[in-house]
Amino acid sequence: IWLIVHHMAGTESIALGGSVRIDAFSNFFSIVIVVATLSIVLATRTWADTLERSIEFYALLLTAAASMSILTQASDLITIFIAIETTSISQFILVAIVKDDKGAEAGLKYLLTGAVAAAVLLYGFVFLFGVSGVVSLDQILNFAESAPEEYRLVLLLSLMFIVAGLGYKMA
């Protein structure tokens, strides 16, 4: 919160050794995430109160929202992966929070497809790190702009894995 308030004073904030960057882009999407989360809380209030685990529902919803907000602020591959997986784990549990066979089946299927997507995404990140030697998005961009011709295919392959993993996660 301090970093967001500090940025609103007109400066860009960088924290955690450059892993997190607060700027106008991340502030805008963090606000969108907060508004969406509040809308979900208001829309599901009566339904969530009927659950045995209503406290867990709200805790998981807030965990997913916080990790999505961190994702908008991430500036390296490790932070991106941790934020995506934290969001995913919260969503896996939210899918299976209702105690019935359909909820358990849906949660397990979502977990398995999410694990495959995470593996594909991480494989792309490994290729990207392997060819560039860095995890910072700024440094990766600088490397990609000046990469020798023999690295272009590996960069393209890593991009394909990353897009496939992210696309699979979003689907």
Each predicted region: which residue ranges?
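Alpha-helical transmembrane segments of multi-pass membrane proteins predominantly involved
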Residues: 1-171
